[in-house]
Amino acid sequence: MGTTASTAQQTVSAGTPFEGLQGSGTMDSRHSVSIHSFQSTSLHNSKAKSIIPNKVAPVVITYNCKEEFQIHDELLKAHYTLGRLSDNTPEHYLVQGRYFLVRDVTEKMDVLGTVGSCGAPNFRQVQGGLTVFGMGQPSLSGFRRVLQKLQKDGHRECVIFCVREEPVLFLRADEDFVSYTPRDKQNLHENLQGLGPGVRVESLELAIRKEIHDFAQLSENTYHVYHNTEDLWGEPHAVAIHGEDDLHVTEEVYKRPLFLQPTYRYHRLPLPEQGSPLEAQLDAFVSVLRETPSLLQLRDAHGPPPALVFSCQMGVGRTNLGMVLGTLILLHRSGTTSQPEAAPTQAKPLPMEQFQVIQSFLRMVPQGRRMVEEVDRAITACAELHDLKEVVLENQKKLEGIRPESPAQGSGSRHSVWQRALWSLERYFYLILFNYYLHEQYPLAFALSFSRWLCAHPELYRLPVTLSSAGPVAPRDLIARGSLREDDLVSPDALSTVREMDVANFRRVPRMPIYGTAQPSAKALGSILAYLTDAKRRLRKVVWVSLREEAVLECDGHTYSLRWPGPPVAPDQLETLEAQLKAHLSEPPPGKEGPLTYRFQTCLTMQEVFSQHRRACPGLTYHRIPMPDFCAPREEDFDQLLEALRAALSKDPGTGFVFSCLSGQGRTTTAMVVAVLAFWHIQGFPEVGEEELVSVPDAKFTKGEFQVVMKVVQLLPDGHRVKKEVDAALDTVSETMTPMHYHLREIIICTYRQAKAAKEAQEMRRLQLRSLQYLERYVCLILFNAYLHLEKADSWQRPFSTWMQEVASKAGIYEILNELGFPELESGEDQPFSRLRYRWQEQSCSLEPSAPEDLL
């Protein structure tokens, strides 16, 4: 007869914090110590004689056992992490191997002084009598008093939202349970943010509770927590923990008092401390609304609406966001938002109209002004402790008061203030989008979730949420904020054409009058035009399309470009800006004494450069179609390219086309592929040969057979032929670039592999974004070719952008683009750049003055 330990596994956290919580790692990466299972016998089949417990686990005594195992305290202790806040405080076990447990509600937080009267700090109701309430984190007994107050005030139905995204544990304090949160030693005053993909805060709280219970068993039934982290006087406090009932998780604190009140419901709705909610978080909120008939406009709905109660730590930031959302819901329920507007005499400028994103929304949405005013009204009703509009304006004012040369580190740095200003504007803008959603979906009882509705309105994702002012910006300020540089320094000549053509990467599509090149100088432009119109090529008409979204000037024979953080601008605005920059750079620098010295002897805008050559080449036409670097072209970019091609070919089928960007690679190649597809549809397709057998690593991906691509192909009529034609166009254009060794289908997987191999987090993030942008570019070319096929009968009267909205979006294309990724290569965990919101905003906000241009 032998002894063996129980086969139940015990998991022990061992120092690696969970992903996203101010550190790296995942919940799955926690080290575990488990007992070996039986090799040949099991408890179920053996004849157990008796069970003798030891200090840690029961020992089961069985017949005919060959092995013996026991667990000892020392083994468990070896896999936990010890730490202390200072040399004067005792050492103790750390939550998740890193975090200290800190009491998160203090008397100073209760600005409204409502803990004694209502049970929770900063308990309040919105102005105007709507049944929307907000509060800070109550204790268990405090929450019971909140419920009593709501009942006493006659609220028969109530929906309570805890909007905290961080894990919260409640420890016994006399006859009550009070809240504590894990905090990092470096940020003891900040909650943990961002649990990472796939981590549910409720599950995390249960895991931490089990961990603290184990710590207490190893420390004479006590665990150390902190109340005052300022000077650590009298810290830490030892809390007695004899069992798991001495610790509560958030769900227990909120749900147990509601057990006997079936008309009162509780939901965990994690909202971010900074910035706007994610679409998934707003979807979760809408799901609760769908399940609450008294909040909907139903025929048999009667009686008052339920009370909506929102709670976070202090009852200020996230609570205020929840209260504004709840107020908008009740305004729609009461019909206040649907009252007809009086005829406007003179529309007053809105407080937030100074921001470009708000002006863009007002221009785009027919009832946009009314929707913004409703959000402003809701914010004002909830502004007793926190006015979101004022926060945005104050942050913007602070940002304007900081000099660019201020220190780069710390909470007062320009970058930190800029980030807070951007987050607050983003939060305000998403409230406007949510109100727009309510206007369309509230009468339909939320037929679409918020995320699906946004995919049906992709133009809203295109609105750049930046701090750019709606007014004109002085060239001097643009130069200060941006990066003025000489193009020659960052435009590599991969095709070695400078010696012959005076310009980098000049090339032609075989057997087609389609050319691509880097940015030419005035001299190089003359050489190219002479080449195109010589006796061999004899092009009478030449359409030149500049794809640069940067302001470009030629100064003293060299081209300079100005990149600045902010959204792209329209072609006419870009050319106006170039004229202003020319005037600014043509002035002598201020403060110079003696003879006048100018920055440059000659300074020309691109329009002026091309106008000069029009005398020698009367058939020259110049277009400016700004396209974003690295990314897929916008829907309107396809419209403008196709219109330029069709207009020229209708006048002269022999017209030649030249496309140029900074290096003549990424944007130029994409536009050349668009031109090839358009030529084929207008003048006839060549015979597409047999599919080439590819015998290389990742052959499937070299052929462009990514899972998300094939998903799109399956949706499109004759999708495989459509993709095959795009591949043929890519191959045709790529024949001109053989020395560059770049191909769109290949570079997608190549960049993905580089991201996986990157050592630095910032570089990995940049490459992850690039690989998805290249993948999106490929998908968009396939969609454009499908459009050319399907709309050919009507001579493409309906623009591609309209077709995408009216046809493709309804087929679910934007929903696919909103889940872009490589599921065949990595787990299905959601990555931020998989979503349209992050990819499209990134191309509006990011500025990489030192990065080389897109190499495709």
Swiss-Prot record:
Positions of N-myristoyl glycine lipidation? 2
Q: Which domain of life is it from?
A: Eukaryota
Record SMART domains? PTPc_motif, PTPlike_phytase
Annotated localization: Cytoplasm, Cytosol
Q: Which residues carry this modification: Phosphoserine?
A: 86
Q: By its UniProt entry, which SUPFAM superfamilies does this protein fall under? A: (Phosphotyrosine protein) phosphatases II
What InterPro entries does the record point to?
A: Prot-tyrosine_phosphatase-like, PTP, Tyr_Pase_cat
An annotated GO cellular component of this protein is:
cytoplasm
Let me know which tissues express this protein, per UniProt. Expressed in endothelial cells, and in certain larger vessels, in mural cells. In the brain, possibly expressed in microglia. Expressed in peripheral blood mononuclear cells (at protein level).
* Family listed: Belongs to the paladin family.
Tell me the protein's name. Paladin
Q: Which organism is it from?
A: Homo sapiens
Question: Which gene codes for it?
Answer: PALD1
